[in-house]
């Protein structure tokens, strides 16, 4: 659902438009790199595990199918639950 919300043109990619939409939705101005990273961190606290996992790949262009394949690879035991927490993923 979040993917569809930020993939406005439905091309299967979340691009720079993501933060523009976040900016509009949150009434915050995201200008500098530091503000951008702070906005990413704020957003990650609001998202469930699968969407939070997307942060690991923030510089890549992934289709929803590619993202789901990567998530499924790391989701070994239960659907939509990762064993490693996000901090461990950042350090991986």
Swiss-Prot record:
Signal peptide range in chain numbering: none
Record's keyword annotation contains Calcium: yes
Entries under InterPro entries matching the protein: Calbindin_Ca-bind, EF-hand-dom_pair, EF_hand_dom
UniProt keyword list: Calcium
Any GO BP annotation: regulation of long-term synaptic potentiation
Cellular-component GO terms for this entry: cytosol; dendrite; nucleus; terminal bouton
Coiled-coil region(s): none
Known tissue expression: Brain.
GO molecular function: calcium ion binding
Domain EF-hand: 18-29
UniProt family annotation: Belongs to the calbindin family.
Other facts: Binds calcium.
PANTHER family attached to this UniProt entry: CALBINDIN, CALRETININ
Protein name per the record: Protein 10
Organism from which the protein derives: Cavia porcellus (Guinea pig)
């Amino acid at each position: 659902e979040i993917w569809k919300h930020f993939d406005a043109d439905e091309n299967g990619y979340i691009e720079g438009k993501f933060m523009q939409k976040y900016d509009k939705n949150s009434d915050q101005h995201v200008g500098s790199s530091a503000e951008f990273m702070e906005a990413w961190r704020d957003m990650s606290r609001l998202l469930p595990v699968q969407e939070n996992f997307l942060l690991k790949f923030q510089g890549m262009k992934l289709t929803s199918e590619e993202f789901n394949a990567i998530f499924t690879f790391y989701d070994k035991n239960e659907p939509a639950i990762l064993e490693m927490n996000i901090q461990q993923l950042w350090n991986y």
